């Protein structure tokens, strides 16, 4: 009986890990058809942000240049104008289809992430007791580690998050999150977040060492600085 109770938090932790994937799979299957029909039948107003408007305008400028070229070649009767105009018409229709698919993809991913957040928040709130048990296990495990291993682990974690090569990892992670929410890629926003996040984390970490570790385990701070130097 005690063994079963001990396994309950592990099952709960496993469910938290796989629940977002399951929610995403179910929402993508159930919501995609509904959102597609809603978008196509309601002809809803587009809610483009500045970045997406810029992308759309660039596409329309390209089409406008094609139309200007169409006007220019009217001077040459031997050119097959009908085929050329037909090609422009097909490109315009294709662009509209791609734009609609992109908008549907954005709404679908944003809705899925919002639903996942709400469900996981409620699931975590209902399982507070299990989370408390897991937290106590983690604290006990960390407490039993030697100061050398703790210092090495902290150093490894900080190098991964705020080290010399960390910006590339942050760029990949933030870019993935940005894409997962369906937002258009914007280099200036991405580079701004990548350059800001490590600095904020570095400040928080130094404050944590100064206020918490110096009080709880001064020997750990000494070992950490010795390894870091």
UniProtKB/Swiss-Prot annotation:
<dbReference type="Pfam" id="PF03040">
    <property type="entry name" value="CemA"/>
</dbReference>
<keyword id="KW-0150">Chloroplast</keyword>
<keyword id="KW-1001">Plastid inner membrane</keyword>
<comment type="similarity">
    <text>Belongs to the CemA family.</text>
</comment>
<keyword id="KW-0630">Potassium</keyword>
<feature type="transmembrane region" description="Helical">
    <location>
        <begin position="189"/>
        <end position="209"/>
    </location>
</feature>
<feature type="transmembrane region" description="Helical">
    <location>
        <begin position="6"/>
        <end position="26"/>
    </location>
</feature>
<keyword id="KW-0813">Transport</keyword>
<dbReference type="GO" id="GO:0009706">
    <property type="term" value="C:chloroplast inner membrane"/>
</dbReference>
<keyword id="KW-0934">Plastid</keyword>
<dbReference type="InterPro" id="IPR004282">
    <property type="entry name" value="CemA"/>
</dbReference>
<dbReference type="GO" id="GO:0006813">
    <property type="term" value="P:potassium ion transport"/>
</dbReference>
<keyword id="KW-0472">Membrane</keyword>
<keyword id="KW-0050">Antiport</keyword>
<keyword id="KW-1133">Transmembrane helix</keyword>
<dbReference type="GO" id="GO:0015078">
    <property type="term" value="F:proton transmembrane transporter activity"/>
</dbReference>
<keyword id="KW-0406">Ion transport</keyword>
<protein>
    <recommendedName>
        <fullName>Potassium/proton antiporter CemA</fullName>
    </recommendedName>
</protein>
<keyword id="KW-0375">Hydrogen ion transport</keyword>
<comment type="function">
    <text>Contributes to K(+)/H(+) antiport activity by supporting proton efflux to control proton extrusion and homeostasis in chloroplasts in a light-dependent manner to modulate photosynthesis. Prevents excessive induction of non-photochemical quenching (NPQ) under continuous-light conditions. Indirectly promotes efficient inorganic carbon uptake into chloroplasts.</text>
</comment>
<keyword id="KW-0633">Potassium transport</keyword>
<keyword id="KW-0812">Transmembrane</keyword>
<feature type="transmembrane region" description="Helical">
    <location>
        <begin position="107"/>
        <end position="127"/>
    </location>
</feature>
<dbReference type="GO" id="GO:0015297">
    <property type="term" value="F:antiporter activity"/>
</dbReference>
């Amino acid at each position: 009986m005690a063994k079963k109770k001990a396994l309950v938090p592990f099952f709960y932790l496993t469910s938290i890990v796989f629940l977002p994937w399951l929610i995403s799979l179910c929402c993508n299957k159930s919501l995609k058809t509904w959102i597609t029909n809603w978008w196509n039948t309601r002809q809803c107003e587009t809610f483009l942000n500045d970045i997406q408007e810029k992308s759309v305008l660039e596409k329309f400028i390209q089409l406008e240049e094609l139309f200007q070229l169409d006007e220019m070649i009217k001077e040459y009767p031997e050119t097959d104008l009908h085929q050329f105009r037909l090609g422009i018409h097909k490109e315009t229709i294709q662009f509209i289809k791609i734009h609609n698919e992109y908008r549907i993809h954005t709404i679908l991913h944003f809705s899925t992430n919002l639903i996942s957040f709400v469900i996981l928040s409620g699931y975590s709130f209902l399982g507070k007791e299990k989370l408390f048990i897991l937290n106590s296990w983690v604290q006990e495990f960390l407490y039993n580690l030697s100061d050398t291993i703790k210092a090495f682990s902290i150093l490894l974690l900080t190098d991964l998050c705020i080290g010399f090569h960390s910006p590339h990892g942050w760029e990949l992670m933030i870019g993935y999150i940005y894409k997962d929410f369906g937002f258009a890629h914007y280099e200036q926003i991405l580079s701004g977040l990548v350059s800001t996040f490590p600095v904020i984390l570095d400040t928080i970490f130094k404050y944590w060492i100064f206020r918490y570790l110096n009080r709880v385990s001064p020997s750990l701070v000494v070992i950490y600085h010795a390894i870091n130097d």
